[in-house]
């Protein structure tokens, strides 16, 4: 879960939610 926050431009998923999640999913897929 820590990687999610770091890969989201330093934003917290709890605050943005879907908006940040959309941009984070791409970073997570590339990381794996």
From Swiss-Prot:
The keyword Disulfide bond applies. Snake venom natriuretic peptide that exhibits hypotensive and vasodepressor activity in rats. It comes from the Eukaryota. It is found in: Secreted. One of its GO terms (molecular function) is hormone activity. Belongs to the natriuretic peptide family. Snake NP subfamily. It comes from Crotalus lutosus abyssus. Negative results: vasodilation does not appear to be mediated by the natriuretic peptide receptor-A (NPR1). Expressed by the venom gland. Keywords: Disulfide bond, Hypotensive agent, Secreted, Toxin, Vasoactive, Vasodilator. SMART domains: NAT_PEP. This is Natriuretic peptide Coa_NP1. Disulfide bonds join 8-24. One of its GO terms (biological process) is regulation of blood pressure. Its main location: secreted. One of its GO terms (cellular component) is extracellular region. It holds the Pfam family ANP.
């Amino acid at each position: 879960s820590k990687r999610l926050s770091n890969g989201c431009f330093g934003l917290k998923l709890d605050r943005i939610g879907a908006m940040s999640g959309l941009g984070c999913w791409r970073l997570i897929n590339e990381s794996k």
